[in-house]
Swiss-Prot record:
InterPro entries: Ribosomal_Su5_D2-typ_SF, Ribosomal_uS9, Ribosomal_uS9_bac/plastid, Ribosomal_uS9_CS, Ribsml_uS5_D2-typ_fold_subgr. This is Small ribosomal subunit protein uS9m. It comes from Kluyveromyces marxianus (Yeast). It is found in: Mitochondrion. The gene is MRPS9. Residues 273-292 are annotated as: Disordered. It comes from the Eukaryota. GO terms for biological process: translation.
Length: 292
């Protein structure tokens, strides 16, 4: 009986001891396990932080259709809002801004549209119209970035002069006709290819076209005209001579340029007969459609 009780107590003691050792095992490695848990938590926290971060775009207009152009517009509009109360003056000569092709190199390339370029010019001209006495370096330095970078000065139109005989030479064109005209002060004599005007041009309309520049400035009978014309028909030749006479009269008096330009004699007429297309009767006329 005693031996049986002792065996049971020993067995229970081993069980209790085994349970104590099983509970005590983690306590033996508590330091290393805590360090591992801390490292795991730190890595998890870092991964969470990195997963929530993103790259900040360099431009605030990154998500627009044309970020670079919009950045330029934002800067100019900020200056406009800052100096909107500054008085403006009427500018006689505007600086040479960057052309559309030149601005495209810094304004978005192929994304740049002509309307966006016009918007830029409007802001530049508005800032440039501020009174020069109140112009601040912030505005002038910003506008200088959009000036045309070239050392060449704009060429001025050189006025043509009369030759040694007091004649003015000009060349006019219309369709395939070319006219070389000499104009000199005289009694109103007009020769075309060494022939009189009435003899060379039979149609009254052609003769009136040649005299039209002189009528526009009230100078009929004050100039002698010698024309050499070739190519085209009679109407085209008459228009070519009219074009050349208008250009030659400007040499005598540059102040007549505005009046002649309004009369339309200084602008070349580029209209040509439209070519015939295959399958059509003429340039646009279609053959009559027949159902059957």
């Amino acid at each position: 009986m005693f031996s049986r009780l002792s065996a049971v107590s020993l067995r229970q003691g081993f069980v209790v001891q085994r349970r104590l050792f099983s509970y005590a095992r983690p306590l033996l490695n508590s330091g290393s396990q805590a360090t591992a848990n801390q490292n795991t938590a730190r890595e998890t926290n870092n991964e969470y932080q990195y997963s929530g971060t993103r790259i900040v775009p360099k431009l605030s207009t990154f998500y627009s259709a044309n970020p670079h152009h919009e950045a330029h517009i934002d800067n100019l509009e900020a200056l406009m809002r800052k100096y909107i109360k500054y008085p403006t003056v009427q500018v006689e000569e505007r600086p040479m801004w960057l052309s559309l092709q030149e601005y495209a190199l810094i304004g978005g390339g192929s994304r740049l549209k002509s309307t966006q370029y016009k918007q830029l010019l409007f802001l530049l001209n508005r800032l440039n119209s501020i009174d020069p006495q109140l112009m601040v370096p912030e505005i002038s330095n910003t506008l200088a970035k959009y000036h045309k970078k070239t050392k060449l000065q704009p060429q001025r139109d050189t006025l043509k002069e009369l030759d040694e005989f007091g004649r003015s030479l000009a060349i006019g064109r219309r369709k395939t006709a070319t006219a070389k005209v000499y104009v000199v002060r005289g009694e109103g004599q007009i020769l075309v290819n060494d022939r009189a005007l009435n003899d060379y041009f039979v149609k009254m309309k052609d003769r009136e076209s040649i005299m039209y520049p002189l009528k526009a400035i009230d100078s009929v009978g004050k100039y002698n005209i010698f024309a050499m014309v070739s190519g085209g028909g009679t109407t085209a030749q008459a228009d070519a001579i009219m074009h050349a006479i208008g250009k030659a009269l400007v040499t005598f008096n540059p102040l007549l340029k505005t009046r002649l330009h309004r009369s339309g004699v200084l602008t070349r007429d580029y209209r040509h007969v439209e070519r015939k297309k295959p399958g059509k009767r003429k340039a646009r006329k279609m053959p009559t459609w027949v159902k059957r």
